């Protein structure tokens, strides 16, 4: 793909995302939004038909004979799912469960189309799931694993991480080959072929359901009424103040689900260093959060909601001299970094800051004429901590309480 075409495609994709999230203005945005509304109506019909087929048992979900924890959301965009998956998987591991995280590996590098077509024509055996981590070591880089699976594998020793679009196949593989007794489906709320024991639904408190429309006019993957399938609802990105209207809406659709409020808290800064052989950040230096105070910094990110990352930096006292925003899961090029470092040197910043998710997409041997740090986040339960602990106990000791 030529650089010109790639640039035009990225610009168009950015425009579409801005229309969906309500950030784009002008006549072109209004006309395009009308077109997307028609597509949204068609998409809604497909979603409803699919759920009806599973509900009426025309299509069947498949139990795998072990505990299956589903973590997902109703919307696209950054609800902060990965830190919740990490917190839950770590708690399960620490309580003695043999945990496997199953991910589809969004935007990971797959075999070329011709190879997949040839396998289909020749009826070749399906390849096994890609093993990102066997619990002992990380085996794939972020390009082949996907950003989130690579992050989870790096941060969770003792937890198996598998990537495959067929999560039933991946789950069976984890059970048979590794003896796993607990499966965690990352971004699995819409994955109906595998029956979940417990459904954890994440809702971004700062933008719960967008404009209320389904894709592609809005950010909803399925109707709001499907809140009813959740066992627990995690309100992420909370500022600690209760939103009674949102809680009432959730309870109206799902009176049984416990609501747990949580916030993403900065933990520390990690300096990006020389290669570790797999790509991504090598933790050669950590700095406390007050290291940012009154520092002149540049910021770049390729995430769904860059505003939240930039707000963290400002709230911690950083003086942002420039920002670069890329598309979610964007693969940075050497030209991108040449431009970023050039601006950083021109504006005499002390260092550059990015997100942990973006750091895993940087070549490990990239020279850094200006220091580069990533901001490590962790999840903090603000309200409903007892409910979170109860959820873990119900999974670890299912005999103590019936699963919903």
Describe every region a protein language model picked out.
Residues 343, 349-351, 357-404:
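Generic C-terminus detector
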Residues 42, 82, 152, 186, ...:
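Residue-level signal for inorganic ion chemistry
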Residues 173-176, 187-293, 298, 310-311, ...:
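Conserved catalytic-core segment of NTP-binding enzymes
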Residues 87-159:
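N-terminal phosphate/diphosphate-binding loop that engages ATP/GTP or pyrophosphate donors
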Residues 151-195:
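Phosphate-binding/switch loop-helix module in NTP-utilizing enzymes
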Residues 267-271, 275, 288-334, 393, ...:
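Redox- and metal-dependent alpha/beta enzyme cores, enriched for Fe-S-associated oxidoreductases
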Residues 70-88:
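Glycine-rich phosphate-binding P-loop
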Residues 8-67, 395, 399:
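A transmembrane-helix-recognition feature enriched in membrane-embedded lipid enzymes
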């Amino acid at each position: 793909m030529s650089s010109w075409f790639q640039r035009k495609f990225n610009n168009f994709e950015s425009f579409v995302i801005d229309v969906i999230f309500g950030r784009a203005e002008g006549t072109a945005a209004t006309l395009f939004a009308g077109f997307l509304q028609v597509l949204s109506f068609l998409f809604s019909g497909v979603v409803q038909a699919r759920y009806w087929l599973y509900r009426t048992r025309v299509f069947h979900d498949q139990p795998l004979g072990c505990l299956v924890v589903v973590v997902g959301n109703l919307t696209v965009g950054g609800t902060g799912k990965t830190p919740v998956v990490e917190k839950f998987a770590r708690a399960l591991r620490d309580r003695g469960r043999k945990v496997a995280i199953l991910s589809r590996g969004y935007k990971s590098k797959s075999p070329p189309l011709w190879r997949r077509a040839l396998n289909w024509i020749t009826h070749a055996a399906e390849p096994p799931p890609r093993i990102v981590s066997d619990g002992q070591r990380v085996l794939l880089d972020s390009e082949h694993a996907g950003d989130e699976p690579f992050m989870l594998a790096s941060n969770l020793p003792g937890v198996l991480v598998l990537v495959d679009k067929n999560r039933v196949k991946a789950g069976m593989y984890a059970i048979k080959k590794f003896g796993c007794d607990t499966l965690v489906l990352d971004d699995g709320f819409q994955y109906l072929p595998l029956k979940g024991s417990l459904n954890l639904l994440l809702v971004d408190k700062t933008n719960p359901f967008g404009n209320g429309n389904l894709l592609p006019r809005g950010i909803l993957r399925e109707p709001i009424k499907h809140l009813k399938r959740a066992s627990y609802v995690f309100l992420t990105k909370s500022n600690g103040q209760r939103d009674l209207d949102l809680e009432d809406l959730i309870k109206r659709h799902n009176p049984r689900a416990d609501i747990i409020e949580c916030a993403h808290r900065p933990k520390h800064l990690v300096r990006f260093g020389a290669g570790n052989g797999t790509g991504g950040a090598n933790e050669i230096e950590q700095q406390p959060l007050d290291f940012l105070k009154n520092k002149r910094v540049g910021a770049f990110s390729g995430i769904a909601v860059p505003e939240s990352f930039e707000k963290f930096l400002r709230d911690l006292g950083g003086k942002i001299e420039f920002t670069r925003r890329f598309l979610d899961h964007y693969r940075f090029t050497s030209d991108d970094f040449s431009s970023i470092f050039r601006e950083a040197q021109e504006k005499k910043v002390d260092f550059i800051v990015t997100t942990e998710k973006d750091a895993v997409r940087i070549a490990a041997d990239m020279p850094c004429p200006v220091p580069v740090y990533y901001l490590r986040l962790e999840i903090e339960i603000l309200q409903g901590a007892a409910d979170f602990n109860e959820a873990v106990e119900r999974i670890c000791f299912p005999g103590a309480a019936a699963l919903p």
